[in-house]
């Protein structure tokens, strides 16, 4: 009985104080909200940085610049417009996540899985994504200029209107992509697999395509001015509407009877000539091993 009375007295003293605190909090609502957002951003970074999970998390607009996510799981998360500049997303799983309009300039994406993710209008300029998986990802109008994508898997990705100028795509898989209107100007595409892709109206001027595989790909109105095609496999490729191609360039490549070229150009058969294969792309650095999985983050907003 004494304990109940004691608690009652404690409440009678505390409730007015709580009411006063609530009133002050209401007056300072804008400042409190700003601080709260900052704390939540730090919490997400701290709690997921080492092998945690945040599946289906709502992180749109969050400031996660410089964050480190190693071996983390963010499947189907929403990061629309998030600030991820300089972030380290190493060996993590972001399959099905939405990075539309996110700023990922200079981010490290080595060995991460972005299968089916959306990067529409995202800024991925100068990112390091060696060995990353972008299979079936939507990178429409994304800025990937200067990005390091050696050995990345972009099979079936949508690159419509994307900017990959100056990107390093050595040994990258670009098979079956839709890259209409994309820019690969000055990009390194040596030993890349571009088979079956749609590169209509793409800009490949001054690109390096040595040892690349362009078989069965289409290049209507694509620009090849000063592009290098040494040992390039163009068997079955449709280059009939390509611009800027010269006989000197085509003579360095090889094709077959199904290769379609602009009028007046001819190609030697790959046949017995044999293709000199480019060396395999360097293996991406192995991501550090993640610690034991943590529980899903309770503090992050979810759908």
Q: How does the language model describe each region?
A:
Residues 12-26:
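Bacterial N-terminal signal peptides
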Residues 2, 8-11, 29-302:
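Tandem repeat scaffolds
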């Amino acid at each position: 009985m004494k304990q109940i009375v004691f608690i009652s007295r404690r409440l009678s003293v505390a409730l007015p104080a709580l009411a006063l605190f609530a009133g002050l909090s209401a007056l300072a609502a804008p400042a409190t909200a700003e601080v709260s957002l900052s704390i939540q951003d730090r919490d997400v970074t701290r709690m997921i940085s080492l092998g945690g999970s945040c599946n289906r998390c709502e992180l749109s607009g969050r400031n996660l610049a410089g964050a480190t996510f190693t071996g983390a799981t963010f499947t189907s998360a929403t990061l629309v417009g998030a600030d991820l500049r300089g972030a380290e997303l190493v060996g993590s799983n972001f399959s099905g996540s939405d990075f539309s309009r996110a700023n990922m300039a200079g981010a490290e994406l080595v060995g991460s899985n972005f299968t089916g993710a959306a990067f529409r209008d995202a800024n991925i300029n100068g990112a390091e994504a060696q060995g990353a998986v972008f299979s079936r990802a939507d990178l429409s109008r994304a800025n990937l200029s200067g990005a390091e994508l050696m050995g990345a898997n972009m099979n079936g990705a949508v690159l419509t209107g994307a900017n990959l100028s100056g990107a390093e795509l050595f040994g990258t898989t670009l098979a079956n992509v839709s890259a209409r209107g994309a820019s690969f100007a000055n990009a390194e595409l040596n030993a890349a697999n571009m088979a079956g892709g749609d590169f209509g109206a793409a800009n490949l001027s001054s690109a390096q395509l040595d040892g690349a595989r362009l078989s069965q790909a289409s290049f209507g109105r694509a620009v090849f001015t000063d592009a290098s095609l040494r040992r390039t496999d163009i068997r079955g490729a449709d280059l009939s509407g390509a611009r800027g191609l010269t006989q000197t360039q085509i003579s360095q490549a090889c094709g077959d009877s199904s290769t379609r070229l602009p009028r007046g150009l001819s190609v030697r058969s790959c046949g017995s000539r044999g293709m000199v294969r480019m060396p395999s792309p360097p293996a991406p650095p192995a991501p550090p091993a993640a610690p034991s999985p943590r529980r899903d983050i309770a503090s992050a907003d979810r759908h």
